[in-house]
Amino acid sequence: MKPTTIALLQKCKQEKKRFATITAYDYSFARLFADEGINVMLVGDSLGMTVQGHDSTLPVTVEDIAYHTRAVRRGAPNCLLLSDLPFMAYATPEQAFENAAVVMRAGANMVKIEGGAWLVDTVKMLTERAVPVCGHLGLTPQSVNIFGGYKIQGRGDAGQVLLDDALALEAAGAQLLVLECVPVELAKRVTEALSIPVIGIGAGNVTDGQILVMHDAFGITGGHIPKFAKNFLAEAGDMRAAVRQYIAEVESSVYPGEEHSFH
């Protein structure tokens, strides 16, 4: 199989072909996802909660991300692999570049960073130095202490601010954008306004792609279950069939449905 590229996702956007992505943290699941047809994966700092058992993503380190990136890359050598830069790993453009180099050497194709227009200089610095960037707007878990919890973002006047941030990130060179926990109406505006692919989670079925935390897709998340989550394993009966169902429902816009969306 040929390696999946950003250009391929751009083609999907142009042709209005929705694509499914998922988080992965180890060799075995990465191989399973790749075998069943998922070609884009994220080593997310969500591993702090799903793998390490913390109550937020804040304790995750660059070394943690690099470790899991190496494992996922071995399991899915041809996938487009995104890796998060964790909390306080990109406070300055120079720090971002140093830490991006670590995860890129570990096997990432692209780094994901959370935040709006304040990241413009960082995005420019990274992309000018051959580090592809995926932005992340809406509910940005590293900002949980600012938000006062995991809450929907972008309602009212905040929606225009988010759209402006998205346009600024694209202009700075970002090649993908993740939108998390925003109203469907705003997600549609952002997706249509940007020329780069937009990947949603809790943003309705109007984005170019969809991502889920693998533990949510398999119904093994402890504690609070997000509204946008769906247990595909319960319906499909086994993990491989669950992954295939997830892909099929994303591509056909069945998932996420109205019951998984915000307004």
Swiss-Prot record:
Any GO BP: pantothenate biosynthetic process
Free-text remark on how the cofactor is bound: Binds 1 Mg(2+) ion per subunit.
Keyword Transferase among record annotations: yes
Documented EC number(s): 2.1.2.11
Pathway it works in: Cofactor biosynthesis; (R)-pantothenate biosynthesis; (R)-pantoate from 3-methyl-2-oxobutanoate: step 1/2
Subcellular compartments: Cytoplasm
Any one annotated GO CC term: cytoplasm
Cofactor dependence: Mg(2+)
Binding site for 3-methyl-2-oxobutanoate: 45-46, 84, 112
Active site, renumbered: 180 (proton acceptor)
Catalytic activity annotation: 3-methyl-2-oxobutanoate + (6R)-5,10-methylene-5,6,7,8-tetrahydrofolate + H2O = 2-dehydropantoate + (6S)-5,6,7,8-tetrahydrofolate
Record text on subunit structure and interactions: Homodecamer; pentamer of dimers.
Family membership noted in the UniProt record: Belongs to the PanB family.
HAMAP family, per the entry: PanB
Protein's UniProt name: 3-methyl-2-oxobutanoate hydroxymethyltransferase
Organism: Citrobacter koseri (strain ATCC BAA-895 / CDC 4225-83 / SGSC4696)
Phylogenetic lineage: Bacteria, Pseudomonadati, Pseudomonadota, Gammaproteobacteria, Enterobacterales
Name of the coding gene: panB
